[in-house]
Each structure stands twice: as structure tokens, then as C-alpha cells.
Amino acid sequence: AELGKDSRRKVSTHRVDVGEPTQIREFARAAIAAHPGLNIVINNAGVALLGGFNEVDQAQMEWLVNINFWGVVHGTRAFLPHLSQQRAAHIVNLSSIFGIIAPPGQTAYCAAKFAVRGFSESLRHELSMANSPVKLSVVHPGGVLTNIVRNSRTGTGITDNARRAESIDRFDAIAKTTPPAAAQRIIAGIEKNQPRILIGNDAKFMDLLQRF
């Protein structure tokens, strides 16, 4: 909306459930019609779930994976045909530091974010082998100061209300990167065509650590 105040830019907004393929396809058609020169797609939707494997039920895990993983797949599939017709284009898929390491208490989130990483890295190779004009980057943010933890759902097996507050406090203590700084890092990564974009010193450290 702020960008729309600049008359040189055309901005359109759309409300979409990324877990619904039909909605994503309709969104892609509308976005391409409004912006025929569209050549960058960023799959960024994500949710969080508080609780270990035995504390979340199957429906909650499927809800998270449907958004965090399948939303990325649906968005990529919907826009890829159009992007492939451009002279140059880029897909950016958001994974996480938890797509690099897998701490306890994050089974659903890690499963989805590791899946995003694997999907993105494999597709990047496929696009390269096909000499496609579409490049692809996968982003691994560390602690970025957003509301994802505050807006998270709580596992059905958790009865201690204090755990949610503790989780928010821990996240706020380690989330040092601001959203604008994260956005600038992603833009720089696109410009350099980086396969893996790491955001924050914590992500860089964990990326290095998991190699040993």
C-alpha cells in the first residue's frame, strides 16, 4: 500500500490461502494480468506450531505442512510457466534456519522447512539443466523479529499456559534481524543469484556448524 503512493509503481493486493491450489492458480492469473512483466516470485507464507511431536495432533501437523511446504510448491507451480517465458526470472522460496538444523520441539516446522530446502535445491538443478531463464534461491532466515511465534498455534497436548509466554520471550531474545534488513539481504541474494541466502549471523553460524 505504501508503494502504491508512488505513481510510478503499480501495486495490487490479493488475499490468498496458499494451501489451496485453486486459489493460488487464480491469484497467479490475476497477478500476471495486472503485472505482465512479473519476473520474480517470493513464496514467503509461513506459520508456527508450539509443541513437540507427542504434543501436536495430526491435523495440526498437516495444517502447518500444508502452508509452509505445499504453499511453496503451489506458488512455484502456478507461476513457473509464466516465468519461463521471461528473458530472466527468479523464484525465491523461504525455508528457515530450521531447514538447516533440527532442534527438539520443532518436528512439524523442521519437516516442512527441510522439505522446502530439498524441493528448492532439486528444482534449481532441474532449471539449470534445462537452460531455463528462471533462477532459484532458497532463503534460510535465523531470528527475524516478526510475529510468527506470537501468532503460532499451540499443540493440543500442551496444558501449561506459561510455555507459550516463555516461547515468545526466548524468540524475542534471539531475534536480532529486522524485517527490512532481511528484505535487503534477500534482494542482494537475488541480484547475485545465490543458491542459498542466509539471513543473520545465527543462520550463517549454523550453516557452517552443520557441515562438520
Regions found by a protein language model. Give the residues of each.
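The beta1-alpha1 cofactor-binding region of Rossmann-like NAD(H)/NADP(H)-dependent oxidoreductases
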Residues: 15-26, 58
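Substrate-binding pocket helix/loop in short-chain dehydrogenase/reductase
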Residues: 52-53, 57-63
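Active-site loop immediately N-terminal to the catalytic Tyr-X3-Lys motif
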Residues: 53-54, 101-108
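Active-site helix of classical SDR
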Residues: 76, 112
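Residue(s) in the substrate-gating loop at a strand-loop-helix junction
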Residues: 96
